[in-house]
Structure formats: C-alpha cells, structure tokens
Amino acid sequence: MTTLIIKKILLLPATCLIPLLTGCNNCPSTTIVEDIIDPAIYTSLPFKMDKVEQPTFPDYSVNIIDFGAKPDGITLNTKAINDAIQQVNAKGGGKVIIPEGLWLTGPIELLSNVNLYTEKNALVLFSADHSLYPIINTSFEGLETRRCQSPISARNAENIAITGHGVFDGNGDTWRPTKKDKLTEGQWKKLVASGGVVDADGRIWYPSEGALKGAILSKDNFNVPRGELTDSDWDYMRDWLRPVLLSFIKCNKVLLEGATFKNSPSWCLHPLSCENITINKVTVSNPWYSQNGDALDLESCNKALIINNSFDAGDDGICIKSGKDEQGRKRGEPCQNVIVMNNTVLHGHGGFVVGSEMSGGVNNIYVDNCTFMGTDVGLRFKSNRGRGGLVENIYISNINMINIPNEALIFNLYYGGKGRGEDPNQDEKKAETTIPPVTEETPIFRNIFIKDVTCNGAGRAVFFNGLPEMRIKNINMENIIVSNAKEGVVLSEADEVNMKNIKIELVKSGKNLKMQNVSNVTIDGKNHAEIGAQGEELNF
C-alpha cells in the first residue's frame, strides 16, 4: 500500500513528489509532501529540541457521499461522516474526503491514522441543536469538569490530520453569552429580540435560562458550576457547558493545515497533553466580541510547530497553558518545546500569551516573525497567586504590532480574569501590608528574552506587575521601538531587568520610564542596583 508521508513542516522548495523505491518490487512509491520548516531552524534554536514528527497516512481514501452524506444544509450528516472515519481507521488509515458543499453535522470524532480532508468550497456547519453534543467529563480552562462534547474531537489518537481548504463553522453564536457593552445599541436590541434571557443587571445576554443558571452557579469558580448536581441539573445547564470547537486530548503526531475554523462556542483550537503537533496555514475567525473566543490554546503539549497561520480572536490569540492551580501542578505536564513563527493575530485580548493557567510550567518557547494588529495587548504574560508553576526560557523576536489599545508587553502577576480592554485597572496592585510566603502556589517567571519588537500605537509600552515575594526575574529586552504610546515603560517588583536600545515615543511629553521596587535594572550598560517604594522616573 502506498504511504503518504506528510512532512509538512518553512523555507524549502515547493511540493515535490519523490518516488522512493527501496528494494520492494511490489511496493508503490512513497509521496513526500513539501517541507515547511528548514531543518536548520532546530539547530539554531536557543534550546535543544527534537524535530516535530509528522503523521503518515496510507494511500487510501473514501468520500463521505458514498456513506450517504448530502450537501443540502438540511440533512444531518453526523453518521455518514463518522462512518467514513471509522471505515478508514478500520482499513489501517487514509483520507476521508469532504467535497464542496454545505454539510450539516453533529460532533465528529477523529480516529487514529485518519486525514480528514476538506475540498475547496466545503463548508461543515455544526448543528445548533445542542442536544446532539453529549455532556462528558473533560478539561476546560485548566480544570477537570463537565462540558458538552466538542464538535471536533480526538482522544488517545495517533497520526491524525485535518487538511484541505474547507471551513468548519462551530455555530458558536447559539452557545455564547454576549456582553451588552461589546455591541452597538441596534445589535443588542436585535440579539435580545431573538430570544434567550438577560441577566439581572441587564448587561449580559444568555441563550437560555439554563445557560444563565450555569453562569450563576459558576460565579467566582472558573466557569465550573458549584454544588451537588444531578444529571438533570447538568442537562438543564447544557447551554452553559460550551465546548471548544476542536478538542484533541493525549494525541500524537497531529497536523492541522489549510482549513478554516470559525465561530467557536468557546475556545477554538485546544490541543491538550498532545505531542508532535503541527498547525500550519490555518485560519481561525471568531467575532472580536466572542466570549472566551480564544483562537489557539496549546495546553501541556510537547514539541509543536505553530506556523504561517492567521488568527482573528475574541479572546487570546496564541496562548500557551499548562493547567490551573492544584490540578495543574498535580498533572505536572509543562507546555514545552514550541516554535511559533510567521503568524498574524487580529483583535482579541493578546497576540502571544502565556497563562494564566500555567501551573504545570512553560519552557522552551521560540516566537519569531509575528504580527499583531489591534489586539488588546501584544505580548502578554499573566498569572496570579495560587497558580504556582515555573515559566522560563521564552525567546521572542521580530514582532511587529499596530494599534494596541493597552500594553505592547505586559507581565502581570495580579491577573483578575478579564481582558485588559474590559477593565484596564482590574489588575493594578493594591497596597499590601503583609507579603505572603513563597509556596508551591507562587508563580515564577524568569529567563525571558525579547528583542527586535516594533509597535506603532499603544496605551502603554511595557508594564511589569510582579509579586513582592517572587519578583519577575532576568527579563531581557533589546531593540524595542514603541511609538505613539500614551504611557512608557512601568516596572514594578522585578529583578535583573536588562534593557538595551529601547526607544519609546510618547504622544505627550514626559518621562517614559518609571520604576518602583526593582533591583539590578541595567539600561544600556548603566546599572540601577535598587529602587524602592519611592520610585524613580527617567527617560531612555
């Protein structure tokens, strides 16, 4: 059987088809599809990282039409699509083809050795009938909980891919709550008139009474409903249990390439505890106002390539996570060995983000040549007391940003749970009379290197908001230009900050560097050993 090896991984010649005859008289050729990352990149990384392995698939394919699927936008094609996947899996692997057309479906479960391929003009629309998505035990926002099954899912699978040029629409508008202040008056009136309910404050619309009840029971509890709940209770709150659009858990050798994923009920792409992941030339399109509408949340994964993608998000764009609080520390799976290159992020709460769920640790992350446009924050590191976890060895370079309403770069260890644009003052440190001791619940951020960053338009250039008991440490910034900034660089509770060739142009005249409770700050070779609570203001 012919094997299709998808080595998809920037900078090498276009697709080449190379017959490999290896002494087997009856073996057909093996197809090697375009490399997309120069192998030399691995050897030039500032940390040691093994190459990301790619999935391989036998040269066998089926078309969902042959299983009874109909592209009329009316017929529910759940069984046909899953039957096709199951047959290809049973045959040892291959390709399931979704041709052009509008395909209505319920949840799709991807199995080992299956490449789900969408042709151009194929639109897969997930049903707005939420009863089709069973309530299952899973993980969301770093905690074990119950949610509805994702429209696309895989668990413990190996050699899986979603490729081609089609679109997967999660029908998220039927799931998500919507905040009034994110819509125009006309949009809000239209939404309320469509059905659903509005909370007691008149600020948030929910798709049903059950969704509102779920929100009330989950208040201040990380979206997890409290109390002794029966199956009937969970079912009533089904609309609150919004799934991520794509959930891959404990999978190995995963490829997402070429397809568009849009309108997710919650997060869009969520690989969890996976290894050898490639996400290349993917488009994510979520409304800018979509609640929890993250584009990509890479959680507790090892060896990943995130390259050549376009992410339009309602929340964080490219986000690195590793579990929350005690559960995340107990899981103990860091997110590590990740290359993020040549991506564009629009809207949302952050371009590249680490946290806030980082309790299992984050290390060995390389981010290069990315563009952020109109994101609330550009480079965003966030956590708070209780998380624990160690974030280190992050290397960021060649970042271009425009129209950043808040910080171009922020380290915030007082994260309050909202986007900076929703409440810029929520995370400001309050006066503390007692400094807590360092424990396993204390998050640590250190050894981070950022260079060659250009930003035009920012609310504030840089903000370090560290913890007094565990200062942000060894942060290195070089060749940073931020123009048209309302405020400059503000450093608080940091140690060993090295800044070289920093240029900050403020909209109004004034000092562009403010420091308080920092030590060992070096600016172009000049060291500031200790600056206390009285603070100091300078110009670069």
Region roles according to the model:
Residues T2-L12, C16-I97, L102-K250, L255-E257, ...:
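Extracellular "leader-to-stem" segments immediately downstream of a signal peptide or signal-anchor
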Residues L102, S273, T283, S322-K324, ...:
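Active-site-proximal loop/turn and secondary-structure-junction residues that shape catalytic pockets
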Residues D233-D235, D294-A295, Q327-K330, R385, ...:
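Outer-membrane beta-barrel domain signature
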Residues M358, G378-N398, N403-F540:
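Extracellular beta-rich repeat passengers
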